[in-house]
Amino acid sequence: MFKYAIVRTPAPTLVSGITSSPELGAPDYEKALQQHRDYIRALEACNVNVTILEPDERYPDSCFIEDVAVCTPAFAMITSPGAASRKGEEDKITGVLADYYD
């Protein structure tokens, strides 16, 4: 079972992030924040230690942290997101992950 999770609080720029369903309209930022808080509570209820990163307005999709790193018990692999709006985001997670790996 997982013991640790790293999450990033959605930034207000989330509403201009990448979407595969534009017909649904822009995300509701306040609802996204509530869902994020609920997600954290659910993880904590499962006895997961949650590291919460601050929002980063430069990267609208940065709350989807799983897109920039694949983690295993032995190592973390930093990915290279294809979208131009995500370039540079991977640099921000490298330092955070270093705290979890030798």
Task: Mark where each language-model region is.
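The feature marks the mature, well-folded catalytic cores of soluble enzymes
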Residues: M1-D102
